[in-house]
Amino acid sequence: MRADNVILVGFMGAGKSSVGRLLARRLGRCFVETDDLITAREGRAIPEIFRTHGETRFRELEAEAVEALREKSGEVVATGGGLPCREGRMQTLRALGTVVWLRGDLGELVARARRAGARPMLAERTAAEVEALYRAREPYYRAAHLSVDTTGLGPDKVVARVLAALRDAHAARALR
């Protein structure tokens, strides 16, 4: 049986953290960020983990965070942008709850991410490299149960769209 978590996935700048916090508040649920699970365990920020241990170690820590999610139920979870993009990860996330892909125009996503700062996967990459990264991740994101376009929308409007998509999906399941 699938846990009743709501799991937000998407590229950097999609709004997973800000939307996740608001969504959790609206649903009366706890909010969990996989990056927070990692930083709490390691005692250092994500950029520092990348700098000192590299991406490979960070991805290992993400795998541990996914395992920790198995203990969660009824929560709103925001994943790191690359977390679902490993073999078998999206399948695991789908078993832990309803996975919602927050998608958007790539230029807008990158602009949001740059404004937020401290993005190791964005630093020192050309626009072409960022686009290639997005295109490589997109097939994984497409495996989400639901997809919500965030282009041109603030967090409140995205939350409204996510809630509507969740209601529609719940109603469709009830009809089966």
Name each model feature, range by range.
Residues M1-R2, L22, R26, K72, ...:
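NTP-dependent small-molecule kinase module
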Residues L8:
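Hydrophobic anchor at the beta1->P-loop junction of P-loop NTPases
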Residues F11-A14:
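P-loop (Walker A) phosphate-binding loop of NTP-binding proteins
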Residues S17:
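Walker A/P-loop
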Residues C30-R94, A118, A127, E138-Y140:
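ATP-dependent small-molecule kinase phosphotransfer cores
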Residues G81-L83, D105-G107, L153-G154:
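Short glycine-rich anion-binding loops that position phosphate/pyrophosphate groups of nucleotides
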Residues A95-P139:
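A glycine- and Lys/Arg-enriched "phosphate-lid" helix/loop adjacent to the NTP-binding pocket
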